[in-house]
């Protein structure tokens, strides 16, 4: 008796179609997953590119001040892009080195674990391999450290065309301080040399009439030291000075009463002026009052007067003592008045 096989045939066909659809569904899922992964990769690339572009754009804005030409702008942009690409490449290289180093460390950890577990001895070949791996690891560590130092030294954002002299710089400040100290020491040595130079002082002991004497002093000596030496010279000729002390004497130069604490150096360096002549010259010329050209300043001066204070108090209302006044360094005498 013949059997009807149509139902079995249809069932087999249906099974085949179901398997085919299942396979297509799996392929579709794989395709969707691949597309999603590609989109993620593309998004990461876009983000990197965007960050890269934003960093370059920000640096370009900060380094460009004022009006610049289009060519200059393009040149700066290209330079910044190249510099940024170098930094990114170094960063990637550093990451690769870090990964290699981690792999080597992991491998070393596994080997160490095997050594602890296994009681078998290692062959010479394995020991040599371990030494080579340690050397390779040390090489990677050294290279990674060098990369980090280079990256720190060469940071993006420093434009060599920008003037940074106003910014604090420790090395520059130390160099400036060193030069300043050298100049100060050189100046002080020069001033000490000037102070040690000898000058001849012409002075006149004044008791109503003049009695000229000369004495050699150093430019660094004070008026008190000068008066002490002048007193030693004058005592043998003037009896009223034999019992006098330095504090009882006054020194009058160009109609100004000079305080005892001032030195000749003070007047020489500042080229100080008095009422009737310069205070920085202490020799005397016979033609001090004969000026051939009134427009040319003469450096000729009068002999300074050494006076007893008691004589001045008695005669300060009489010429020439009536013209004398205390020296004031703030007061300027631009024109001399000789009478």
From Swiss-Prot:
Residues of the signal peptide: none
GO biological process: mRNA processing; regulation of RNA splicing; RNA splicing
Tissues showing expression: Widely expressed in embryonic and adult tissues.
One Gene Ontology term, aspect cellular component: nucleoplasm
Compositionally biased intervals (Basic and acidic residues): 168-177
Presence of keyword Coiled coil: no
Main location: nucleus
Motif stretch (Nuclear localization signal): 152-155
Region (Disordered): 1-31, 150-177
Family of the protein in this entry: Belongs to the FAM50 family.
Protein's name according to its UniProt entry: Protein FAM50A
Organism: Mus musculus
Organism classification: Eukaryota, Metazoa, Chordata, Craniata, Vertebrata
